[in-house]
Amino acid sequence: MADPARARKLADRIKVIVAERLDRGLRDPRLGFVTITDVQVTGDLQHATVFYTVYGTDQERADTAAALTAATGMLRSEVGKNITARLTPTLQFQLDAIPENAAHIEDLLRQARDHDTEVAGLAEGAAYAGEQDPYVKPREAN
């Protein structure tokens, strides 16, 4: 089991290497606008999961996933050339759901804001039922 700090450094290095290689371009027309968001490496440094997002439609996401799967070997050899680890970790690409989750959270926050505005509007014109405040009674001095 490797030191967690070493695993994190290796993950950061893999993220940079893969992102730079994708920035230089692959010869695959299916590859869309890809952003590498994170890399997680197992404790034994044997496997790396590369999380990515794709800007575009569902079809472009599927095409990009196929292109990354096809280019896994080439990207792994690129990683192997640029790291100092004894063994090169296997790469697995996983679509990151951050944009979809963020949009869902933004929608929920908008709904909550709208509901708060509606409640505040109803509270402005509201009055207590009965007296001003039926629970507050003046104290009598003995």
From Swiss-Prot:
Gene3D superfamilies: 3.30.300.20
Places the protein is found: Cytoplasm
Family matches, as Pfam families: RBFA (PF02033)
InterPro entries, per database record: KH_dom-like_a/b (IPR015946), RbfA (IPR000238), RbfA_dom_sf (IPR023799)
UniProtKB keywords: Cytoplasm, Ribosome biogenesis
Main location: cytoplasm
GO molecular function terms attached to this record: ribosomal small subunit binding
Biological processes annotated in GO: maturation of SSU-rRNA
Transmembrane feature ranges: none
SUPFAM superfamilies (UniProt xref): Ribosome-binding factor A, RbfA (SSF89919)
Record-level GO cellular component terms: cytosol
Subunit structure: Monomer. Binds 30S ribosomal subunits, but not 50S ribosomal subunits or 70S ribosomes.
HAMAP family membership: RbfA (MF_00003)
Chain's role: One of several proteins that assist in the late maturation steps of the functional core of the 30S ribosomal subunit. Associates with free 30S ribosomal subunits (but not with 30S subunits that are part of 70S ribosomes or polysomes). Required for efficient processing of 16S rRNA. May interact with the 5'-terminal helix region of 16S rRNA.
Similarity field: Belongs to the RbfA family.
NCBIfam families: rbfA
Protein name: Ribosome-binding factor A
Species per Swiss-Prot/TrEMBL record: Leifsonia xyli subsp. xyli (strain CTCB07)
Gene: rbfA
